[in-house]
């Protein structure tokens, strides 16, 4: 049986565990009348961004500890050092955390290890058939943020005792750390975000400019709309309901999931991207990523992809006329139940590979692909085993 967690030897603790304590980390408000920019520099931080209704920027940061000793609490708190200052029209906030990148963190210490209890695990049957999903499906998925309760967390885990026997874990022996960090901002502020090993949820629609440089960070947005937006994301994950305008770069991102995009450019590498609906003015440049494109708006115009070593899974536009053209070489095509393997070019020269529909259609999908895989379908895509 594989060990799920690293085994941690129990140390002699000189201070007694505290049942539950709430510690205030940072609480401050700023009048935003003369402010234009908010700069956030975060490391190991979990935070919600919400709309302010009084033209002030509010920081409210607390952490609740359960079953931690006073010494352990002090060790965690001394690493978290939030600070803020106003420079001209710019409010700067910086927080270096203890890699608290989740709303709730559970910690278990054991002398002899922890295992899965197989009888309590339900495995889904593998499937090679992937169905089209609606834009609404992605909106609902992106709005869901429920984490596991302690009961769910412990359901499939068993502690090993000194005799090698498995037993249920007593919840009183589980350390629980709950983070509650909220920043409320007025709508007129531009945002400059630098984040490492963090988790951020924007629970407001953003129309002002936002520039993001994030590493190993999970980001979730509602609506982003500004032509000057610029995102550079490495690792982590990215979710949004609506992206309208701006430039987005994703590198080695575990999952990009967007309900609707339009009027923007995506530059990606080694990333899995799922899009609910393509609107007008979308261009994607990619190297060695995987795409799932489920729907198109009625007037998406020209959708352009320029890819190398990429896997593209695309469901046809519904209810409208369209034209599809693939251009390149050394690319496998799967159209419904028909497959075609376009050979490589000795001179590395591209040519027209496949055409669907009439070129006079106002809605065009143009895919330039080299060394890739392209699949088209109406309702479902069958993946090779």
Q: Language-model segments: which ranges?
A:
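Intrinsically disordered, low-complexity terminal regions
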Residues: 2-8, 19-233, 237-251, 255-385
């Amino acid at each position: 049986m594989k060990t799920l967690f690293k085994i941690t030897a129990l140390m002699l603790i000189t201070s007694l565990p505290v049942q539950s304590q709430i510690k205030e980390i940072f609480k401050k408000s700023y009048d935003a009348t003369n402010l234009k920019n908010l700069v956030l520099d975060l490391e190991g931080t979990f935070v919600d961004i919400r709309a302010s209704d009084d033209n002030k920027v509010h920081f409210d940061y607390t952490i609740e500890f359960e079953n931690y000793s006073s010494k352990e609490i002090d060790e965690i708190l001394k690493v978290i050092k939030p600070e803020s200052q106003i420079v001209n029209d710019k409010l700067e906030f910086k927080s270096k955390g203890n890699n608290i990148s989740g709303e709730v963190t559970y910690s278990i210490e054991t002398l002899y290890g922890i295992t899965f209890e197989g009888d309590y695990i339900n495995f889904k049957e593998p499937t090679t058939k992937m169905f089209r999903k609606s834009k609404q499906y992605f909106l609902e998925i992106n709005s869901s943020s429920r984490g596991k309760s302690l009961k769910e967390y412990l359901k499939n885990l068993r502690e090993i005792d000194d005799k090698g026997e498995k037993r249920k874990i007593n919840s009183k022996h589980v350390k629980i750390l709950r983070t509650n960090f909220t920043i409320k901002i007025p709508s007129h502020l531009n945002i400059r975000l630098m984040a490492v090993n963090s988790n951020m949820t924007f629970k407001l629609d953003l129309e002002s400019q936002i520039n993001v440089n994030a590493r190993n960070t999970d980001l979730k947005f509602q609506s982003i709309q500004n032509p000057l937006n610029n995102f550079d994301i490495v690792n982590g994950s990215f979710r949004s309901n609506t992206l309208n305008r701006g430039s987005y770069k994703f590198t080695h991102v575990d999952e990009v999931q967007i309900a609707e995009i339009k009027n923007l450019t995506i530059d990606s590498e080694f990333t899995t991207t799922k899009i609910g609906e393509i609107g007008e003015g979308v261009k994607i440049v990619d190297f060695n990523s995987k795409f799932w494109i489920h729907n198109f708006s009625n007037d998406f115009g020209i959708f352009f992809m320029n890819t190398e070593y990429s896997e593209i899974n695309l469901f046809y536009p519904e209810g409208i006329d369209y034209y599809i053209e693939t251009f390149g070489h050394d690319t496998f095509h799967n159209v419904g139940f028909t497959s075609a393997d376009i050979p490589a070019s000795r001179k590395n020269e591209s040519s027209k590979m496949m055409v669907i529909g009439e070129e006079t259609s106002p809605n065009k999908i143009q895919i330039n692909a080299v060394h890739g895989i392209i699949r088209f379908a109406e309702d479902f895509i069958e993946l090779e085993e």
